[in-house]
Amino acid sequence: MNDLALALGLGIPLSLLVGVIIGYFISIKIFKKQIRDNPPITENQIKAMYAKMGRKLSETQVKEIMRSIKNQK
């Protein structure tokens, strides 16, 4: 009976700790993938930002800016 209580007393917290650590790394990986696939700034936002500064960007320049944002890691 004592062995079972000791095993449960050590096994449950250890399992919870391992689960929390694994969950943390999985959530970080998913978050980074979502940010990479859906950057927090859009092409329209870039165009609007440059329009406020008095510049009109071509599509090539907008794509280049988006590519440079995605390549920053």
UniProtKB/Swiss-Prot annotation:
Q: Name one Pfam family in it.
A: UPF0154
User: Where is the protein localized?
Assistant: Membrane
One cellular component term from this protein's GO annotations in UniProt: membrane
What main location does UniProt list?
membrane
**Source organism superkingdom:** Bacteria
Q: Topology with regard to the membrane?
A: Single-pass membrane protein
* InterPro entries registered for this protein in UniProt: UPF0154
Keyword vocabulary terms for this entry: Membrane, Transmembrane, Transmembrane helix
> Which residues span the membrane?
6-26
- Per the similarity annotation, which family is this? Belongs to the UPF0154 family.
Any idea what this protein is called?
UPF0154 protein MG335.1 homolog
